[in-house]
Amino acid sequence: MSEQQELQPAFSIEKIYVKDISLEVPNAPQVFLEQAQPEIDMQLASAGQQLDDGFFEVTLTVTVTAKLPEKTMFLCEVAQAGIFQIRNIPGEDLDPILGVACPNILFPYARETVSSVVNRAGFPPVLLAPINFEALYMQQRAQQAEAGNA
């Protein structure tokens, strides 16, 4: 490889995998007799870490809880992770890649895993809406800036 090619910005997906998965159905089997529609709550968390020179792991954790007024139907948590090769990217551009681009890649995998696991537990599949990770990232940055000025 020429020196110029080695200095070109590079981004590639090395591996996508499920790092952790859990499902709890604390009120089975009675919960399967319920007729009411549950309230679905979804929480997201994303974290990135450098593994090696130019290699980063990003983990997107999706937690979905289905609740009835007085009991939990299920709690499903999926930690979908990926190893990404990111080279020759300026420092100020690295954070948005780890906080926006990588979660955008991981979310469809996490969404499918949640739906499949919930369905295998005997519930209708949960269809999670797409997430605007750029808007979430900008919101977090604004909150951090506000907290820094307080």
UniProtKB/Swiss-Prot annotation:
GO cellular component: cytoplasm
Superkingdom per UniProt: Bacteria
Keyword Transmembrane helix: no
NCBIfam families, alphabetized: PRK05751.1-3 (NF004392), PRK05751.1-4 (NF004393), PRK05751.1-5 (NF004394), secB (TIGR00809)
Keywords for this protein: Chaperone, Cytoplasm, Protein transport, Translocation, Transport
Alphabetical list of InterPro entries matching this protein: SecB (IPR003708), SecB-like_sf (IPR035958)
Primary gene name: secB
UniProt keyword Ubl conjugation present: no
Single Gene Ontology MF annotation: unfolded protein binding
Subunit structure and binding partners: Homotetramer, a dimer of dimers. One homotetramer interacts with 1 SecA dimer.
Name of protein: Protein-export protein SecB
A biological process term (GO) from this entry: protein folding
Family the UniProt entry places it in: Belongs to the SecB family.
Compartment(s) where it occurs, according to its Swiss-Prot or TrEMBL record: Cytoplasm
Function: One of the proteins required for the normal export of preproteins out of the cell cytoplasm. It is a molecular chaperone that binds to a subset of precursor proteins, maintaining them in a translocation-competent state. It also specifically binds to its receptor SecA.
